[in-house]
């Protein structure tokens, strides 16, 4: 298992020790330095939150400056399920390490993902021993849910946001994820940004902000 190192971060605006942690998981070929750009849009509403955006443990083979949670050599459902499963232990270990470091619990934690990072956030977040406060997923998809029917899993609230013009991850992925999460009894809210490609827009940022504030408050 590859270890995830500390990456980009934004300390609590309050200047005090963190009372919450928001972990942002970037997309394929990107890095935490890119996704941490979301944090300043939310920091004023979550002044006691520590924002962490670690790099994935693998260098991206096709984009030498970026990182990947796993290699996207195949895009069928079984390959995606295997990929998320292979990368999950490193993410879980990173989460556990940070919660222990700051004396916090899963209720104090929110996960945010973009694209491949959304796949990781959903995979790991649904399989924690205790529910995180919430999961926000931008422009991603849900993988490997069949196994959940045969084991215990947690049901944190989920927000999924997707652009209708996404050329990388088709918008149908959101609709499929919503259907599957509802079938599993996971509370899910979705939003489609009309005309948006593989990106996060101002509406998505605001929705993420509002969701995180409510989720972290209600989890305590």
Region spans (language model):
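C-terminal catalytic histidine-bearing segment of alpha/beta-hydrolase fold enzymes
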Residues: 175-220
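Serine-hydrolase catalytic machinery in alpha/beta-hydrolase-like enzymes
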Residues: 2-108
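Primarily recognizes the serine-hydrolase "nucleophile elbow" in alpha/beta-hydrolase
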Residues: 107-154
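Alpha/beta-hydrolase-fold catalytic nucleophile elbow
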Residues: 54-55, 112, 136-139, 161, ...
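Short beta-strand/loop motif that positions the catalytic acidic residue
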Residues: 160-162, 166
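Short N-terminal helix/helix-N-cap motif within the alpha/beta-hydrolase-1
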Residues: 32-33, 146, 201
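Short alpha-helix in the alpha/beta-hydrolase fold that links the catalytic acid
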Residues: 37-39, 170-180
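Short, proline-enriched alpha-helix->beta-strand connector loops that line the catalytic pocket
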Residues: 107, 153-158, 184-187
């Amino acid at each position: 298992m590859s270890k995830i190192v500390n990456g980009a971060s934004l300390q609590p605006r309050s200047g005090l020790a963190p009372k919450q942690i928001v972990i942002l998981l970037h997309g394929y070929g990107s890095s935490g330095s890119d996704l941490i750009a979301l944090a300043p849009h939310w920091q004023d509403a979550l002044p006691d939150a520590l924002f962490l955006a670690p790099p994935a443990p693998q260098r991206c083979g096709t984009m030498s400056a970026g990182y990947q949670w796993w290699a996207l050599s195949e895009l069928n459902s079984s390959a995606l399920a295997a990929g998320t499963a292979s990368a999950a232990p490193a993410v879980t270990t990173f989460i556990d390490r940070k919660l222990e470091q700051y004396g916090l619990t899963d209720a104090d934690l929110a996960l945010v993902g973009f694209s491949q990072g959304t796949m990781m956030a959903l995979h790991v977040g649904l399989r924690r021993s205790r529910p995180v406060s919430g999961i926000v997923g931008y422009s991603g998809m849900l993988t490997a849910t069949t196994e959940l029917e045969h084991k215990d899993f947690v049901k944190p609230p989920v927000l999924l946001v997707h652009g209708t013009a996404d050329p990388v991850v088709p918008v149908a992925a959101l609709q499929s994820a919503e259907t599957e999460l509802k079938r599993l009894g996971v509370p899910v809210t979705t939003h489609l940004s009309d005309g948006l490609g593989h990106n996060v827009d101002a509406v998505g940022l605001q929705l993420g902000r509002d969701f995180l504030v409510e989720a972290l408050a209600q989890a305590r």
